Each structure stands twice: as C-alpha cells, then as structure tokens.
Design a protein with these regions (language model features):
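All-alpha prenyltransferase/terpene-synthase fold signal
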Residues: 1-297
Length: 297
C-alpha cells in the first residue's frame, strides 16, 4: 500500500504508514480463514488460531467437539480482524472520496480472494485441473490481495487516475502469480524452519498445484502411483515426501514452474518500465519482484 501511494505521487508518508496496517489486518483475516480451510496447524512457526483454540477446547470442554470450537473461534477472530482493517481505512483521514473508493476496491479484493479460495478447494476435491485453471486460481486467490490490492489501495488514496490503477495491475498480476508458484515450490522443497509451517502440508491436503499438474502430464506409471499415493495422504512419512519430490524433479515439473515464475517476473518488470511512477516506488517494486522468486528453498 505504501509504495502504491508513493507511485501515485502521495506525500503524507506518516499517514499512509498508519493506514497500511489495514491491509495487514485484512491479510491476517484471510490467512486465518485459509488455515481453517487447509486444516493447517502451524504458521510462522506458531500454532494457527484454529489449532490454538482446538487445544483449549480439548482441555476445557471435554464433552464437546474441540475441532468445531477451534474452527469457530478462528472464524470469529478472523472476522473481527477483517472488520478492524476496514475501520482503520475508513478512519484514515484521507480525502473522503478517495477513502470511499479505496473501501470499495478493498471489498473487490476480498471478494476475488474468496472466489480464488473456492476455486482452490474445488480443484483439490476434484483431483485434477489444467494449467489455465490453476493460474486463474492463483490470480484470484493470491495475486489480488498480496500485490495488486495493496498497490491499488495506496494509489487510490493518493488520488491516482484509473489509467495508473490499470497500469499497476499489469505489473502486479504476473508478479503475484509468480509469488504463489514460488510458495508452492517452498511448500514442497523448502526448509520448515524458514517456511514457518509444515513442509508437505500441501501434499497431505491433495493440493492441485502447478507442480502437480505438470508432473501428471509427464509421469510414467510408477511415478503416477507415487503421486496418487501421496496426494491427500494425512499420514505422510519423510520418505513419502522425498519420493514425491523426486517425481516432481524427474518429470521436470520443478524446472517448468521455476521457468514460468521467472518469465512472469520479467513480464511484470517490463510493464513497470512502461509507465512513469515515483523513483522510490519503482526501485522497490523492481526489487521486490526479484525477491519473489529468490526466497530460499
């Protein structure tokens, strides 16, 4: 949000920094709900909200369903944090017309993220997808709220014209998709300590990521058997994850995903060069795009 504001020529840096808390709270709200959907127990090397309250439920309310208690509390807390994010934006003190426009845009971002979540869940349960469907899901689920949405909100609060808003999208969408591809790679090949969550959780949940669908396209019979035995298996062993990784490498799915993410980053950076924005914002957006695919495995 901060650099979207600067990109559009905004000058009140202190105010936009305070206001940027709003998008962080919206981010947390979405992640809390995402953890419930994905049944994740760990994030940022800490218990997820649903996991934390499930443990409380087991300890205090032995006659009741602890998982339901944990998930219910997480939904409530997520909703409350989302409302706080909206309130901070509403009370930000920018031009009223810009605040109204930004709040409207924020609801658009949340709506598309929810659509992306539903696409992710549907594809997971269906057990198959093509590349176009997966990339469209990545755009809705991730690119909208991680990159495009914050840039738009900041630019809108600075009074940016619609032309600049649209130009920022040309940068944000490919970079946001590349971010999700790298996230998928880290989810299988990354360090659990650095990742802050369980490596292999996407495999256990049966996520139909770009890596999975490309591996399916090129796998032989034995490799297909390994993929099918691991995906959706809640009792994965380290040896199972190692075998899964081996298939992803041998089918060149990893190489394909890395190549596509690099291509998307180049696309986003090239778009950034096509329109005039403030130098500080341009330098940051250029650097953060590179960082998206350099996050450590």
């Amino acid at each position: 949000m901060y650099y979207g504001y600067l990109a559009a020529g905004g000058r009140d840096k202190e105010r936009i920094i305070r206001t940027a808390i709003s998008i962080e709270l919206i981010h947390i709200f979405l992640l809390i709900h995402d953890d419930i959907i994905d049944r994740d127990l760990k994030r940022h090397n800490l218990k997820t909200v649903n996991s934390y309250y499930t443990e409380i439920g087991r300890r205090l309310f032995k006659k009741f369903d602890a998982n339901h208690f944990g998930n219910s509390m997480a939904i409530i807390i997520g909703d409350m944090i989302g409302a706080m994010g909206n309130k901070i934006l509403f009370d930000s003190g920018f031009e009223p017309k810009n605040i109204v426009k930004a709040l409207s845009q924020l609801q658009y971002v949340i709506s598309y993220t929810v659509v992306g979540e539903s696409q992710d869940l549907y594809i997971e349960y269906l057990g198959k997808a093509n590349e176009q469907e997966v990339l469209r899901m990545y755009e809705n689920k991730t690119a909208k709220y991680t990159i495009e949405g914050p840039l738009h909100l900041g630019a809108i609060l600075a009074g940016a014209p619609d032309k600049l808003i649209n130009q920022l999208s040309q940068y944000a969408i490919p970079v946001g998709i590349a971010f999700q591809i790298q996230d998928d790679i880290l989810g299988i090949f990354g360090s659990e300590k650095k990742l802050g969550k369980t490596v292999g959780s996407d495999i256990a949940e049966g996520k139909q990521t770009l890596l999975v669908i490309k591996a399916r396209e090129k796998c032989n019979r034995l490799q297909k058997r390994i993929l099918n035995s691991c995906l959706g298996n809640k009792n994965l062993k380290t040896s199972d994850i190692d075998e899964f990784r081996k298939v992803i490498r041998e089918t060149s799915a990893l190489e394909y995903a890395q190549s596509l993410s690099q291509k998307l980053i180049r696309q986003g950076k090239n778009e950034l060069d096509k329109f005039p924005i403030e130098k500080e914002a341009k330098i940051f957006l250029d650097d953060i795009a590179d960082f998206m695919i350099k996050r450590e495995l």
